[in-house]
Amino acid sequence: MSVVRWPRVLTPSLLSQILKKQKNPVTALKLFEEAKERFPSYGHNGSVYATMIDILGKSNRVLEMKYVIERMKEDSCECKDSVFASVIRTFSRAGRLEDAISLFKSLHEFNCVNWSLSFDTLLQEMVKESELEAACHIFRKYCYGWEVNSRITALNLLMKVLCQVNRSDLASQVFQEMNYQGCYPDRDSYRILMKGFCLEGKLEEATHLLYSMFWRISQKGSGEDIVVYRILLDALCDAGEVDDAIEILGKILRKGLKAPKRCYHHIEAGHWESSSEGIERVKRLLTETLIRGAIPCLDSYSAMATDLFEEGKLVEGEEVLLAMRSKGFEPTPFIYGAKVKALCRAGKLKEAVSVINKEMMQGHCLPTVGVYNVLIKGLCDDGKSMEAVGYLKKMSKQVSCVANEETYQTLVDGLCRDGQFLEASQVMEEMLIKSHFPGVETYHMMIKGLCDMDRRYEAVMWLEEMVSQDMVPESSVWKALAESVCFCAIDVVEILEHLISSKR
């Protein structure tokens, strides 16, 4: 029987709204099927299929998702490339990379004219699973097709993989061949190859690469360029070639940044300490000089700050924030997120909390769900999941900041790891109400934890919820429940009645 009040006239947008409101993905699929029976003149479009596929993918219901994808192919409705990219990620996450490859190879059977995002996503997932040879085969076979209208992301990925296995020589060949592929190296291309050269100690090649930037892509004072320049300068300093680094800095300031002379920092060649502390000091001075030489703009400061924070260079990153504020720019949520992440990695949780509670408020910048998620993960990883729950409550009171699946999943996993199963149960209940679906492992962890706490009725309720979603509990879950029954006078018949009624 239907669980919704159907409208007199059904449209795809109305059905999408109905499906999104369903707590159970199985129920959503039944309504999806029922729609055509109730409304003979109605037809699903690409948007409805995308909604249904997204719901099934997020709940890891791979078989049902494959069924809906097959239906979408039969209906021949227009499909977005982003839908297939999402499905490819879902297949990979479920350990079914072969299904992802098979789907991509069959895209010509769907009404989809652009495969660029799916192509890039598949290659990324194959590289992640160390399927390098197969990824190269896919690249060679499909990179020239008209469906893939941009190859720069795939080529950058190929260069990155080659550099990771210390084959910057091959990555350099890919870089040089880009023009023949109908694309042009971007800053990411230069950054990847520069890092590859420097990691292998090929500083001469890295220097020539930097010079080529001056006339190929560099813009006056661009902070995005500084990210690449700094890789070489740091590598030269680490190799003890500080004098060369200072000389190249001068060329960067004159040709790359075209900075005024007042921005030149007084670092004289030969006047530096050869100790590790001395070299680190020179590196900091070089970075400060680059920051001063950049043309003040939000994009430049953002690129420099996030790059430094990603490398864990908190002091230098903070100097960028001070510089941008002095020029009248305020850090964005993206920059704050990078700073919070760096602080959490460094174990400085108090400072990370202060960024959200104090620094962002003073800068009149409201935290986004992304910033909150970074802090919540940092707190949970440090065993402070109960403190992290407070930020879920804080998000609910903030306008236009809605907790997403990552928020809930991180909190539930963190609370369970800390043995806070009752609190985890409450968060997971809210998670389901918001139509975010935990995975099988989360249910297993929750049920076994509640049994260990002698909270059998709550455990049974989650088992009932699990079974209602057609999930099959593993043997250890049944064992935990059986042991709980044996040690306490709980009615076994009552448990069975719960499970039987949930399947009706």
UniProtKB/Swiss-Prot annotation:
Highest taxon above the source species: Eukaryota
Alphabetical list of PANTHER family matching this protein: PENTATRICOPEPTIDE REPEAT-CONTAINING PROTEIN 3, MITOCHONDRIAL (PTHR47941)
Family membership: Belongs to the PPR family. P subfamily.
Claim: Ribosomal protein is one of the keywords in the record: no
Disulphide linkage map: none
Species the sequence originates in: Arabidopsis thaliana
Matches recorded under Pfam families: PPR (PF01535), PPR_1 (PF12854), PPR_2 (PF13041)
Keywords: Repeat
NCBIfam families: PPR
Repeat is among the record's keywords: yes
Annotated PPR repeat ranges: 45-79, 80-114, 115-145, 151-185, 186-216, 225-259, 260-296, 297-331, 332-367, 368-398, 404-438, 439-473
Name of this protein: Pentatricopeptide repeat-containing protein At1g05600
InterPro entries: Pentatricopeptide_rpt, TPR-like_helical_dom_sf
